[in-house]
């Protein structure tokens, strides 16, 4: 009997040690910023994968429905938001990159107002739209040049982020009181 209790104790401590050794999972939301629409993708830091999620309507660079975006972040228990930063090929900031930066700051502010504790980061997304369109054609996901690929672009953004998270720029992290 003592042996059984000892074995259970060892098994429980092994399970606890295994759980402590595993990296903590964070669900990521990637946003391919746009003036008319914004692609969304979900990613996972443990499995290191990302998948297209949805395309959000934008009104001149701002979400047509902020509550919807904030609700997605809250409902999916997003641990980090990664906003694509569309830099010029030489690395300089484009007009749309400046708008993406402004959007990321507004998003961080809105999250703080709602007391949703999620860091927001910017990540270079040069050529993701070109790559997404090529991939979508090859896989037969689109049939027309005008078919939306924003969610696929967001997915590629997250895959790049997962491979190089140190290259992201922090916008804001909400600190609980």
Swiss-Prot record:
UniProt GO molecular function: nuclease activity
CDD domains referenced in this protein's UniProt entry, alphabetically: YqgF
Example of a GO biological process term: rRNA 5'-end processing
UniProt KW keywords: Cytoplasm, Hydrolase, Nuclease, Ribosome biogenesis
Function: Could be a nuclease involved in processing of the 5'-end of pre-16S rRNA.
PANTHER family per the UniProt record, alphabetical: POLYNUCLEOTIDYL TRANSFERASE, RIBONUCLEASE H-LIKE SUPERFAMILY PROTEIN
Entry-linked HAMAP family: Nuclease_YqgF
Protein name per UniProt: Putative pre-16S rRNA nuclease
Record lineage: Bacteria, Pseudomonadati, Pseudomonadota, Gammaproteobacteria, Moraxellales
